[in-house]
């Protein structure tokens, strides 16, 4: 049998090829993300960060898919978020199911549904503040969380309305919430102010009050987007739910009074000086031309999902 000789140069080439292939496999198997450092860190450390359960009540309306599509992009970017969508319907809808499927979020989402009692539904031209909204939906989400979340693993609950605007950096801050704490931060464009924010001690470690202009006497005069809650607090306080029986603007205080006190709040967002969420609201859709078509038995979106 003839002897096979491999020259040193051939050995070197084989080693180089092997190393290149190894680097490519390693690179393809590793999570990568382009963007600011906090986003890269969250992307790489997603498996070690506390899961953030974002609870979004939603209801059928012309802009619903647009609102949820915008929010879905946050979840695509942030691997440690789990989206709990609760529809105000008698059954979950194809529109929301299709949206989650197209966004690739089926494994990082939970879709629930419960109808708001008719006596608490807005009617006609009712202003959106006249009745409490999302009470049934948020309470159903809390019941699901108490029954399904691993109590031994730290996780966080955030009530995420579908029409607000959120920076990805907000969720980096939220990930810092300690067990047994409620994290707080400023919210822009709310309560008649450019920003509502907690007021802190000089060292920035304690909340001493709030700058709220509307009903500042509330126990917690903050917006629903201004806080997130360590899940263990909900486990230890099963009575913590939202209620129809509270005054207008007191839903936040109603849930927080069961869970914490002002002096136990955890200030975040650079000592509550960074605005990372805005209380925006989509203008009511004007569809006069569509209504004229419907009167003729026609529609612009026949066979389409808008």
UniProtKB/Swiss-Prot annotation:
Keyword Kinase belongs to the record: no
Cofactor: Mn(2+)
Parts of the chain on the Lumenal side: 30-306
Transmembrane segment boundaries: 12-29
GO CC aspect terms: Golgi membrane
Gene Ontology MF term list: galactosylgalactosylxylosylprotein 3-beta-glucuronosyltransferase activity; metal ion binding
Membrane topology summary: Single-pass type II membrane protein
Catalytic reaction annotation: 3-O-(beta-D-galactosyl-(1->3)-beta-D-galactosyl-(1->4)-beta-D-xylosyl)-L-seryl-[protein] + UDP-alpha-D-glucuronate = 3-O-(beta-D-GlcA-(1->3)-beta-D-Gal-(1->3)-beta-D-Gal-(1->4)-beta-D-Xyl)-L-seryl-[protein] + UDP + H(+)
Documented EC number(s): 2.4.1.135
Similarity comment: Belongs to the glycosyltransferase 43 family.
Protein name: Galactosylgalactosylxylosylprotein 3-beta-glucuronosyltransferase I
Species of provenance: Drosophila melanogaster
């Amino acid at each position: 049998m003839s002897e096979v000789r491999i020259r040193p140069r051939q050995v070197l080439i084989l080693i180089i090829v092997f190393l290149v292939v190894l680097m490519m496999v390693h690179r393809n198997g590793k999570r990568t993300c382009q963007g600011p450092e906090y986003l890269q860190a969250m992307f790489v450390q997603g498996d070690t960060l506390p899961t953030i359960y974002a609870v979004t009540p939603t209801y059928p309306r012309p802009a619903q898919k647009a609102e949820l599509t915008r929010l879905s992009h946050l979840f695509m970017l942030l691997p440690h978020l789990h989206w709990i969508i609760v529809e105000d319907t008698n059954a979950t809808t194809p529109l929301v199911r299709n949206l989650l499927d197209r966004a690739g979020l089926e494994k990082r989402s939970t879709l629930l549904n419960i109808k708001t009692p008719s006596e608490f539904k807005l009617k006609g031209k009712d202003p959106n503040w006249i009745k409490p909204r999302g009470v049934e939906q948020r309470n159903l989400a809390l019941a699901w969380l108490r029954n399904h979340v691993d109590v031994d693993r730290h996780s966080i609950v955030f009530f995420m309305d579908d029409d607000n605007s959120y920076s990805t950096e907000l969720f980096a801050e939220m990930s810092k919430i300690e067990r047994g704490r409620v994290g707080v931060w400023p919210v822009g464009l709310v309560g008649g102010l450019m920003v509502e924010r907690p007021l802190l001690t000089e060292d920035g470690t304690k909340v001493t009050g709030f700058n709220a202009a509307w009903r500042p006497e509330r126990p917690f005069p903050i917006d629903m987007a201004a806080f997130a809650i360590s899940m263990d607090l909900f486990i230890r306080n099963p009575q913590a739910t939202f209620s129809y029986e509270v005054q207008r603007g007191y839903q936040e205080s109603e849930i927080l009074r069961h869970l914490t006190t002002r002096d136990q709040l955890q200030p975040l967002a650079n000592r509550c000086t960074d605005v990372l969420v805005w209380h925006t609201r989509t203008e009511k859709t004007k569809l006069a031309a569509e209504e004229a078509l419907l009167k003729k038995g026609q529609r612009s979106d026949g066979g389409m999902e808008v």
